[in-house]
Protein backbone atom coordinates (compact mmCIF):
# COMPACT_ATOMS: atom_id res chain seq x y z
CA UNK A 1 0.00 0.00 0.00
CA UNK A 2 1.44 3.38 -1.02
CA UNK A 3 2.17 5.78 1.85
CA UNK A 4 -0.10 8.77 2.39
CA UNK A 5 0.83 11.99 0.60
CA UNK A 6 -0.09 15.33 2.18
CA UNK A 7 0.00 18.88 0.83
CA UNK A 8 -0.04 21.76 3.32
CA UNK A 9 -1.06 25.23 2.19
CA UNK A 10 0.76 27.68 4.44
CA UNK A 11 4.32 27.77 5.71
CA UNK A 12 3.80 29.52 9.04
CA UNK A 13 4.50 28.00 12.43
CA UNK A 14 1.39 25.82 12.36
CA UNK A 15 2.04 24.55 8.85
CA UNK A 16 5.69 23.80 9.58
CA UNK A 17 4.90 21.98 12.82
CA UNK A 18 2.31 19.92 10.96
CA UNK A 19 4.86 19.12 8.26
CA UNK A 20 7.47 18.07 10.81
CA UNK A 21 4.96 16.02 12.82
CA UNK A 22 3.84 14.19 9.68
CA UNK A 23 7.43 13.60 8.60
CA UNK A 24 8.11 11.95 11.94
CA UNK A 25 5.24 9.57 11.17
CA UNK A 26 6.77 8.63 7.83
CA UNK A 27 4.36 10.67 5.72
CA UNK A 28 5.51 12.55 2.61
CA UNK A 29 4.66 16.26 2.86
CA UNK A 30 4.80 19.18 0.43
CA UNK A 31 4.35 22.69 1.85
CA UNK A 32 3.03 25.42 -0.44
CA UNK A 33 3.90 28.93 0.75
CA UNK A 34 2.28 31.92 -0.95
CA UNK A 35 5.16 34.31 -0.23
CA UNK A 36 8.25 34.49 -2.41
CA UNK A 37 10.39 33.52 0.59
CA UNK A 38 9.68 31.34 3.57
CA UNK A 39 9.93 33.22 6.85
CA UNK A 40 8.22 35.03 9.72
CA UNK A 41 7.86 38.67 10.64
CA UNK A 42 10.01 40.09 13.42
CA UNK A 43 8.17 39.74 16.71
CA UNK A 44 8.27 37.75 19.90
CA UNK A 45 6.40 34.55 20.61
CA UNK A 46 5.83 32.42 23.69
CA UNK A 47 5.59 28.64 23.78
CA UNK A 48 3.95 27.39 26.94
CA UNK A 49 4.66 23.80 28.07
CA UNK A 50 1.86 22.37 25.91
CA UNK A 51 3.67 23.56 22.77
CA UNK A 52 7.24 23.09 24.00
CA UNK A 53 6.45 19.46 24.79
CA UNK A 54 5.42 18.84 21.19
CA UNK A 55 8.46 20.52 19.65
CA UNK A 56 10.88 18.71 21.96
CA UNK A 57 9.26 15.39 21.11
CA UNK A 58 10.00 16.21 17.47
CA UNK A 59 13.72 16.27 18.21
CA UNK A 60 14.07 20.03 18.54
CA UNK A 61 15.41 20.42 22.06
CA UNK A 62 18.94 21.45 21.07
CA UNK A 63 17.75 23.89 18.43
CA UNK A 64 15.26 25.45 20.84
CA UNK A 65 17.78 25.81 23.65
CA UNK A 66 20.06 27.70 21.27
CA UNK A 67 17.44 30.37 20.53
CA UNK A 68 15.20 30.54 23.60
CA UNK A 69 14.98 33.05 26.41
CA UNK A 70 13.57 31.60 29.62
CA UNK A 71 11.38 33.78 31.85
CA UNK A 72 11.51 32.99 35.55
CA UNK A 73 8.06 34.34 36.38
CA UNK A 74 4.86 35.73 34.97
CA UNK A 75 4.13 39.05 36.67
CA UNK A 76 0.87 40.98 36.67
CA UNK A 77 1.00 44.71 37.46
CA UNK A 78 -1.42 47.56 38.02
CA UNK A 79 -1.53 50.21 35.35
CA UNK A 80 -1.17 53.43 37.37
CA UNK A 81 1.61 52.51 39.78
CA UNK A 82 3.14 49.23 38.60
CA UNK A 83 2.17 47.45 41.80
CA UNK A 84 2.56 43.68 41.49
CA UNK A 85 -0.89 42.09 41.62
CA UNK A 86 0.26 38.50 41.33
CA UNK A 87 3.24 36.38 40.37
CA UNK A 88 3.25 32.91 38.80
CA UNK A 89 6.43 30.85 38.80
CA UNK A 90 7.71 29.74 35.39
CA UNK A 91 11.32 28.64 34.81
CA UNK A 92 12.20 25.48 36.71
CA UNK A 93 8.67 25.22 38.09
CA UNK A 94 7.23 24.63 34.62
CA UNK A 95 9.82 22.01 33.76
CA UNK A 96 9.28 20.13 37.02
CA UNK A 97 5.49 20.40 37.00
CA UNK A 98 4.72 19.95 33.29
CA UNK A 99 7.94 18.27 32.15
CA UNK A 100 8.26 20.98 29.53
CA UNK A 101 9.50 24.58 29.54
CA UNK A 102 7.92 27.98 29.08
CA UNK A 103 10.19 29.74 26.60
CA UNK A 104 10.27 32.99 24.62
CA UNK A 105 11.66 33.37 21.10
CA UNK A 106 11.99 35.70 18.18
CA UNK A 107 9.36 34.34 15.79
CA UNK A 108 11.82 34.29 12.91
CA UNK A 109 14.27 32.19 14.94
CA UNK A 110 11.61 29.64 15.90
CA UNK A 111 10.32 29.46 12.34
CA UNK A 112 13.84 28.97 10.97
CA UNK A 113 14.57 26.22 13.49
CA UNK A 114 11.45 24.21 12.62
CA UNK A 115 12.11 24.72 8.91
CA UNK A 116 15.65 23.38 9.31
CA UNK A 117 14.32 20.35 11.18
CA UNK A 118 11.88 19.66 8.35
CA UNK A 119 14.79 19.56 5.90
CA UNK A 120 17.34 17.73 8.06
CA UNK A 121 18.62 14.83 5.92
CA UNK A 122 19.29 12.79 9.05
CA UNK A 123 15.78 13.17 10.43
CA UNK A 124 13.15 10.42 10.50
CA UNK A 125 10.89 9.97 7.51
CA UNK A 126 11.11 11.72 4.14
CA UNK A 127 12.35 15.31 4.17
CA UNK A 128 9.64 17.90 3.64
CA UNK A 129 9.41 19.52 0.20
CA UNK A 130 8.87 23.30 0.15
CA UNK A 131 7.49 25.39 -2.70
CA UNK A 132 7.46 29.19 -2.43
CA UNK A 133 5.52 31.71 -4.51
CA UNK A 134 2.83 29.03 -4.49
CA UNK A 135 -0.43 30.62 -3.41
CA UNK A 136 -3.33 28.19 -3.66
CA UNK A 137 -6.09 29.73 -5.80
CA UNK A 138 -8.19 26.65 -6.57
CA UNK A 139 -8.93 23.25 -5.07
CA UNK A 140 -9.84 20.66 -7.70
CA UNK A 141 -11.85 17.88 -6.08
CA UNK A 142 -13.09 16.14 -9.21
CA UNK A 143 -11.50 13.03 -7.67
CA UNK A 144 -12.88 13.18 -4.11
CA UNK A 145 -10.06 11.06 -2.67
CA UNK A 146 -7.22 12.97 -4.39
CA UNK A 147 -7.65 16.74 -3.94
CA UNK A 148 -5.48 18.94 -6.13
CA UNK A 149 -4.17 22.29 -4.90
CA UNK A 150 -3.76 24.63 -7.87
CA UNK A 151 -1.44 27.61 -7.44
CA UNK A 152 -1.53 31.01 -9.08
CA UNK A 153 1.18 29.92 -11.51
CA UNK A 154 -0.97 27.02 -12.67
CA UNK A 155 1.01 24.26 -10.97
CA UNK A 156 -1.04 21.38 -9.62
CA UNK A 157 -0.24 19.47 -6.44
CA UNK A 158 -2.21 16.26 -6.00
CA UNK A 159 -2.31 14.39 -2.70
CA UNK A 160 -4.39 12.18 -0.43
CA UNK A 161 -5.05 15.12 1.89
CA UNK A 162 -4.86 18.89 1.61
CA UNK A 163 -4.34 20.81 4.86
CA UNK A 164 -5.22 24.49 5.00
CA UNK A 165 -2.79 26.07 7.45
CA UNK A 166 -2.93 29.41 5.68
CA UNK A 167 -3.87 31.69 8.52
CA UNK A 168 -6.78 33.70 9.84
CA UNK A 169 -7.89 34.75 6.34
CA UNK A 170 -7.55 31.26 4.96
CA UNK A 171 -7.96 30.93 1.20
CA UNK A 172 -8.37 27.17 1.49
CA UNK A 173 -11.27 27.66 3.89
CA UNK A 174 -13.00 29.92 1.38
CA UNK A 175 -12.30 27.59 -1.54
CA UNK A 176 -14.02 24.63 0.12
CA UNK A 177 -17.05 26.72 1.03
CA UNK A 178 -16.91 26.73 4.82
CA UNK A 179 -18.79 29.61 6.48
CA UNK A 180 -17.17 32.95 7.19
CA UNK A 181 -16.69 32.95 10.97
CA UNK A 182 -14.35 35.94 11.22
CA UNK A 183 -15.31 38.39 13.99
CA UNK A 184 -13.90 41.87 14.66
CA UNK A 185 -12.88 42.10 18.32
CA UNK A 186 -13.15 45.87 18.70
CA UNK A 187 -9.49 45.94 19.75
CA UNK A 188 -6.17 46.74 18.14
CA UNK A 189 -2.63 45.69 18.97
CA UNK A 190 0.64 47.60 18.80
CA UNK A 191 3.69 45.36 18.40
CA UNK A 192 7.22 46.64 18.96
CA UNK A 193 10.72 45.24 19.32
CA UNK A 194 12.85 47.56 21.45
CA UNK A 195 16.64 47.06 21.34
CA UNK A 196 17.86 45.74 24.65
CA UNK A 197 20.82 48.12 24.84
CA UNK A 198 18.39 51.04 25.12
CA UNK A 199 16.70 49.29 28.02
CA UNK A 200 19.98 48.63 29.83
CA UNK A 201 21.34 52.17 29.45
CA UNK A 202 18.38 53.88 31.13
CA UNK A 203 18.06 53.46 34.93
CA UNK A 204 14.29 53.86 34.50
CA UNK A 205 14.09 50.64 32.45
CA UNK A 206 17.11 48.63 33.54
CA UNK A 207 14.90 46.66 35.93
CA UNK A 208 13.47 44.89 32.89
CA UNK A 209 16.68 42.90 32.44
CA UNK A 210 17.48 42.26 36.10
CA UNK A 211 15.31 39.13 35.98
CA UNK A 212 13.68 37.79 32.84
CA UNK A 213 9.93 37.79 33.30
CA UNK A 214 6.74 37.73 31.25
CA UNK A 215 4.84 40.82 32.38
CA UNK A 216 1.21 41.86 31.96
CA UNK A 217 -0.02 45.31 33.01
CA UNK A 218 -3.79 45.47 33.62
CA UNK A 219 -5.65 48.73 33.05
CA UNK A 220 -9.14 49.99 32.24
CA UNK A 221 -9.94 49.10 28.60
CA UNK A 222 -6.33 48.25 27.71
CA UNK A 223 -3.25 46.32 28.75
CA UNK A 224 0.46 45.82 28.06
CA UNK A 225 2.54 42.65 27.66
CA UNK A 226 6.33 42.56 27.46
CA UNK A 227 9.20 40.10 27.71
CA UNK A 228 12.81 39.79 26.58
CA UNK A 229 13.87 37.67 23.60
CA UNK A 230 17.24 36.61 22.19
CA UNK A 231 18.58 36.71 25.76
CA UNK A 232 18.14 40.44 26.10
CA UNK A 233 18.81 41.58 22.55
CA UNK A 234 15.22 42.82 22.27
CA UNK A 235 12.28 43.60 24.49
CA UNK A 236 9.09 42.40 22.81
CA UNK A 237 6.11 44.65 23.58
CA UNK A 238 2.45 44.06 22.74
CA UNK A 239 0.04 46.85 23.67
CA UNK A 240 -3.71 46.33 23.29
CA UNK A 241 -6.39 49.02 23.30
CA UNK A 242 -9.80 49.82 21.80
CA UNK A 243 -9.52 49.94 18.01
CA UNK A 244 -9.90 53.21 16.16
CA UNK A 245 -11.94 53.55 12.98
CA UNK A 246 -8.76 54.53 11.15
CA UNK A 247 -7.05 51.25 11.99
CA UNK A 248 -10.11 49.09 11.37
CA UNK A 249 -10.91 50.68 8.02
CA UNK A 250 -7.37 51.42 6.84
CA UNK A 251 -5.64 48.20 7.75
CA UNK A 252 -2.26 47.71 9.45
CA UNK A 253 0.03 50.72 9.72
CA UNK A 254 3.33 51.75 11.25
CA UNK A 255 3.42 54.34 14.04
CA UNK A 256 5.96 55.89 16.38
CA UNK A 257 6.46 55.89 20.15
CA UNK A 258 4.45 59.09 20.61
CA UNK A 259 1.23 57.39 19.53
CA UNK A 260 2.10 54.33 21.56
CA UNK A 261 2.59 56.35 24.74
CA UNK A 262 -0.45 58.48 23.99
CA UNK A 263 -2.62 55.38 23.92
CA UNK A 264 -1.68 54.74 27.56
CA UNK A 265 -2.08 58.17 29.22
CA UNK A 266 -1.45 58.49 32.95
CA UNK A 267 0.09 55.05 33.18
CA UNK A 268 3.03 54.39 35.50
CA UNK A 269 6.23 56.24 34.58
CA UNK A 270 8.06 52.94 34.13
CA UNK A 271 5.62 51.89 31.43
CA UNK A 272 6.07 55.20 29.61
CA UNK A 273 9.85 55.00 29.91
CA UNK A 274 9.72 51.59 28.27
CA UNK A 275 7.33 52.60 25.46
CA UNK A 276 9.33 55.75 24.70
CA UNK A 277 12.23 53.62 23.48
CA UNK A 278 10.31 52.10 20.57
CA UNK A 279 11.34 52.90 16.99
CA UNK A 280 9.14 54.55 14.37
CA UNK A 281 8.10 51.16 13.01
CA UNK A 282 5.61 49.99 15.63
CA UNK A 283 3.02 47.82 13.87
CA UNK A 284 -0.59 48.64 14.69
CA UNK A 285 -3.40 46.39 13.47
CA UNK A 286 -6.99 45.46 14.27
CA UNK A 287 -7.59 42.16 16.04
CA UNK A 288 -9.97 39.51 14.72
CA UNK A 289 -10.87 36.02 15.84
CA UNK A 290 -12.98 33.17 14.52
CA UNK A 291 -16.33 32.26 15.98
CA UNK A 292 -16.05 28.66 17.22
CA UNK A 293 -17.24 26.24 14.56
CA UNK A 294 -16.63 22.47 14.60
CA UNK A 295 -16.48 22.24 10.79
CA UNK A 296 -12.77 21.85 10.26
CA UNK A 297 -12.90 19.43 7.35
CA UNK A 298 -14.69 18.90 4.07
CA UNK A 299 -13.92 15.64 2.34
CA UNK A 300 -10.17 15.25 1.98
CA UNK A 301 -9.45 18.87 2.95
CA UNK A 302 -8.73 19.78 6.58
CA UNK A 303 -8.02 23.05 8.36
CA UNK A 304 -5.46 23.72 11.06
CA UNK A 305 -4.58 26.62 13.36
CA UNK A 306 -5.93 30.10 12.69
CA UNK A 307 -7.78 28.86 9.62
CA UNK A 308 -10.26 27.11 11.91
CA UNK A 309 -9.84 28.56 15.42
CA UNK A 310 -8.11 31.96 15.31
CA UNK A 311 -8.18 33.41 18.80
CA UNK A 312 -7.37 36.65 20.58
CA UNK A 313 -3.88 36.84 22.11
CA UNK A 314 -5.05 36.96 25.73
CA UNK A 315 -3.81 33.43 26.46
CA UNK A 316 -0.71 33.62 24.21
CA UNK A 317 -1.92 30.33 22.75
CA UNK A 318 -2.58 30.92 19.05
CA UNK A 319 0.56 29.21 17.73
CA UNK A 320 0.57 26.69 20.58
CA UNK A 321 -2.92 25.49 19.72
CA UNK A 322 -1.90 25.12 16.07
CA UNK A 323 0.99 22.95 17.24
CA UNK A 324 -1.43 20.80 19.22
CA UNK A 325 -3.51 20.45 16.04
CA UNK A 326 -0.39 19.32 14.21
CA UNK A 327 0.54 16.67 16.78
CA UNK A 328 -2.95 15.18 16.96
CA UNK A 329 -3.53 15.21 13.20
CA UNK A 330 -0.20 13.49 12.56
CA UNK A 331 -0.95 10.92 15.22
CA UNK A 332 -4.31 10.06 13.67
CA UNK A 333 -3.03 9.92 10.10
CA UNK A 334 -0.19 7.61 11.14
CA UNK A 335 -2.76 4.97 12.12
CA UNK A 336 -4.34 4.66 8.67
CA UNK A 337 -3.76 4.13 4.98
CA UNK A 338 -5.40 6.31 2.34
CA UNK A 339 -8.73 4.54 2.71
CA UNK A 340 -8.91 5.48 6.39
CA UNK A 341 -8.22 9.20 6.08
CA UNK A 342 -11.87 10.21 6.53
CA UNK A 343 -12.03 8.39 9.86
CA UNK A 344 -8.70 9.88 10.92
CA UNK A 345 -9.98 13.39 10.19
CA UNK A 346 -13.13 12.75 12.19
CA UNK A 347 -11.03 11.70 15.18
CA UNK A 348 -8.79 14.77 14.74
CA UNK A 349 -11.77 17.10 14.93
CA UNK A 350 -13.30 15.16 17.83
CA UNK A 351 -10.11 15.41 19.86
CA UNK A 352 -9.21 18.99 19.05
CA UNK A 353 -12.28 21.12 18.29
CA UNK A 354 -13.73 21.26 21.80
CA UNK A 355 -10.33 21.85 23.38
CA UNK A 356 -9.48 24.67 20.98
CA UNK A 357 -12.92 26.21 21.49
CA UNK A 358 -12.35 26.32 25.25
CA UNK A 359 -9.08 28.17 24.72
CA UNK A 360 -10.79 30.54 22.28
CA UNK A 361 -13.53 31.22 24.82
CA UNK A 362 -11.04 31.79 27.63
CA UNK A 363 -9.07 34.22 25.47
CA UNK A 364 -12.26 36.12 24.70
CA UNK A 365 -13.20 36.20 28.39
CA UNK A 366 -9.80 37.64 29.21
CA UNK A 367 -10.55 40.57 26.92
CA UNK A 368 -12.99 41.68 29.62
CA UNK A 369 -11.05 40.24 32.54
CA UNK A 370 -7.87 42.18 31.76
CA UNK A 371 -9.67 45.48 31.17
CA UNK A 372 -12.01 45.82 34.16
CA UNK A 373 -12.38 49.48 35.23
CA UNK A 374 -11.06 50.38 38.67
CA UNK A 375 -13.52 49.57 41.42
CA UNK A 376 -14.94 46.66 43.43
CA UNK A 377 -14.95 44.24 40.48
CA UNK A 378 -11.33 45.06 39.69
CA UNK A 379 -10.37 44.58 43.34
CA UNK A 380 -12.08 41.19 43.35
CA UNK A 381 -10.21 40.22 40.17
CA UNK A 382 -6.87 41.21 41.67
CA UNK A 383 -7.56 39.18 44.80
CA UNK A 384 -8.47 36.19 42.64
CA UNK A 385 -5.28 36.50 40.60
CA UNK A 386 -3.20 36.50 43.75
CA UNK A 387 -4.47 33.04 44.67
CA UNK A 388 -5.32 31.34 41.34
CA UNK A 389 -3.10 29.44 38.92
CA UNK A 390 -4.68 30.87 35.78
CA UNK A 391 -7.25 33.29 34.46
CA UNK A 392 -10.97 33.22 33.67
CA UNK A 393 -12.24 29.66 34.14
CA UNK A 394 -9.24 28.03 32.48
CA UNK A 395 -6.37 27.08 34.78
CA UNK A 396 -2.81 26.91 33.60
CA UNK A 397 -2.67 23.34 34.88
CA UNK A 398 -5.29 22.35 32.28
CA UNK A 399 -4.02 24.63 29.53
CA UNK A 400 -0.35 23.76 29.79
CA UNK A 401 -1.00 20.03 30.02
CA UNK A 402 -2.31 20.22 26.46
CA UNK A 403 -4.53 17.92 24.45
CA UNK A 404 -4.01 14.36 25.71
CA UNK A 405 -2.17 12.18 23.23
CA UNK A 406 -2.73 8.46 22.95
CA UNK A 407 -1.32 6.26 25.71
CA UNK A 408 0.95 4.64 23.17
CA UNK A 409 2.70 7.97 22.76
CA UNK A 410 3.19 8.83 26.41
CA UNK A 411 6.83 7.78 26.37
CA UNK A 412 7.51 9.44 23.03
CA UNK A 413 6.10 12.74 24.26
CA UNK A 414 8.00 12.56 27.55
CA UNK A 415 11.39 14.21 27.75
CA UNK A 416 12.97 14.56 31.15
CA UNK A 417 14.54 17.91 31.99
CA UNK A 418 16.74 16.35 34.65
CA UNK A 419 20.32 16.73 33.47
Listing of model-derived features with the role each one plays in the protein:
Residues 5, 28, 234:
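Residues at the starts of beta-strands that form the adenosine-phosphate
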Residues 38-39, 171-172, 310-312:
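Catalytic P-loop NTPase motifs of RecA-like helicase/translocase cores
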Residues 75-77, 81-85, 103, 112-279:
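Conserved FAD-binding catalytic core of PHBH/FMO-like flavoproteins
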Amino acid sequence: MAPIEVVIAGGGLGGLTAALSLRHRGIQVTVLEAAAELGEVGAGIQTAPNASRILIALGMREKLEAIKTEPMDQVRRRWENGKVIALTALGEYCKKTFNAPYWHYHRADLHSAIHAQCLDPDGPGPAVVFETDAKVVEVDRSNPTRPVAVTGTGKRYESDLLIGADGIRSTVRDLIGLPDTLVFSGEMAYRALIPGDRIVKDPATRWLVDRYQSTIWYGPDRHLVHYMIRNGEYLNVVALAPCTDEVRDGGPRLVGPEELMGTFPDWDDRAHAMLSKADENVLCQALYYRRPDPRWTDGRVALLGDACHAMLPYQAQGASQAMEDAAVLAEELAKVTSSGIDDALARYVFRRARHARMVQDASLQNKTFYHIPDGPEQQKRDATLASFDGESDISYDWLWSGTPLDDSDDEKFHYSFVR
